[in-house]
Amino acid sequence: MIRNIDELSYMMLKKSLDATSARDRVIAHNIANVNTKGYKAFRVVFEEKLNGVLKGERLALKVTNEKHLNDGSGIENLSYDLKKDNSSSMRLDGNNVDIDNEMANLAANAILYNALVSQANSKIAMRRFIISEGRR
């Protein structure tokens, strides 16, 4: 259970970094299969779920034991989803990977990842400063 806003921001950063890392792997997998006959691209869905949690929507939960209770309202339960892109293809082989789109997504994801890492580093530096009471 998250107890304060600082824990919430760390958890959001962690979940966002997990999703952007997964998206990077998925995009790389799509690019690697650009010439595979019949291959359908995959997408990582995360931002919509994050926005829903921030608006107070409940998450569908997975439990390992039916006796475990959880209301699904916290960011602790948030994770990304993998979705197969079943859109049609202009190619004759049925592959729907657009290399230009994938490269643009890869660049945008790298920028987002770097921004999240910078934010996390700033939070850690601030905590380190507070712990040392401002002394160097």
Across the structure, where does each feature detected by a protein language model lie?
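Amphipathic alpha-helical polymerization modules
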Residues: 1-136
